[in-house]
Amino acid sequence: MRIPVEYIWIDGARPTKRLRSKIKIVDVEDRTNVSLGDMPDWGFDGSSTGQAEGNFSDCKLVPVRVYNHQYDHIPLVLCEVFHSDGIVHETNTRHALARMQEELIDEDVWVGLEQEYTFFQGQRPLGWPEGGYPPPQGPFYCGVGADEVFGRGLVLEHMYSCLNYGIQLSGINAEVMPGQWEFQVGSGDPLKMSDDLIVARFLLYMLGEKHGINVSLEPKPVRGDWNGAGCHVNFSTKSMRQDGGLELIHEACARLGDRHKDHIAVYGHGNEARLTGLHETCSINEFRWGISDRGASIRIPMDTAFNRKGYLEDRRPAANCDPYEVCHILMETICK
């Protein structure tokens, strides 16, 4: 049986990589349960994606995870990028995370990813008055009503699409700035959660196309007294989740502080406009951690402090971060 499948990959755009996709027609035995074994390697013009020069432009797509839809929609195939000779491409950050996760398998790392994003219609956030501004922030976070939240129909459509594709979505909410939303993925192993986040972003972009709404992952989409957009990461190891784990979380915070600049370097372009010390952030030039402190670099949730075990939340990553790079450096800093 011949069916269409959508190959998805991350390009080499700078300073922030983008998603690319194209459709391939493949032969499968069971269209309701397409597997990696059904998916051949493919190629693309790397000179058009910032991943090759025009005189040697072929790059290879290697399928690494298939997302089947429970109601027979087109399967989605997440791919890694390789050079035509089979060498891992420099833009392929997933490959390094897969190796790191295998190396640290006994740590049993879990992550949860909180993806914030902003809807735009034309040059202004969705729901904002033309040529003006909405009322000050306050009523919009988890708001209800057509005067407080904008784009809920698309958000719910995205939620169900993610669930139907088997993405480990754990929640959604309207955010502090009007026109801004968040969805959460996880918790689970870093590679699967990062894959799920990339495919969830892809679905959000595709639904935005359908509705004529642009989806922005800019860390500070509107200058001024408005919240930015982040991708907070909830992180734990098996030992942190066990009795006495709080001491290990404190040790992890100290390690993270020692490598603050290294982390900021891979936490998303334009993050300096967001990490100002205002709007529930810590200054990009400062590192501190605290219990239940959303103005800290690292927040230890109240339940974690009370139970003396659990997880930490790294609040520094920007909405446009590469989750593979973020999870890789967190594991490297905390677990090695």
What are these model-derived regions, one by one?
Residues M1-K336:
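Glycine-rich, acidic/polar active-site loops that bind/position phosphate-bearing ligands
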